[in-house]
Amino acid sequence: MISSLERFENIDDSSITAIQEEIDYLMDTLEILRATNEISNDAFLEAGSIQGGLSLILNLLSQGISEAEANSQLLRLKERAKSLNGTYPELDTKIESRR
């Protein structure tokens, strides 16, 4: 999950398309990994919180949130993803292997 978020250094209105593409990629990939039993249901649900966080940032950007606030939200999401990586160390590799 952290690799997905590391694609975004600083986000602004021009990031909207890339964020949407990443949300779609995560949604599809996580579903495949869960359906093929490559990740546990718990990992799937927790990873969904990162995808949901990206969706929140996307919605806030479309509502005109400041770049500073968007990047603050992104930083918090990256911290959550690092924690998730500690719990499920194989998750990031499995997600990235599907690109």
Residue ranges and their predicted role:
Residues 2-44, 86:
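N-terminal acidic leader/helix
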Residues 2-8, 13, 54, 74, ...:
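Intrinsically disordered, low-complexity regions
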Residues 8-19, 43, 50, 63, ...:
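Intrinsic-disorder-associated interaction segments
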Residues 16, 23, 30, 47, ...:
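Generic L/I/V-rich hydrophobic alpha-helical segments across diverse proteins
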Residues 32-39, 56-63, 67:
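General structural signal for alpha-helix termini and helix-helix connectors
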Residues 64-99:
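Amphipathic alpha-helical binding modules
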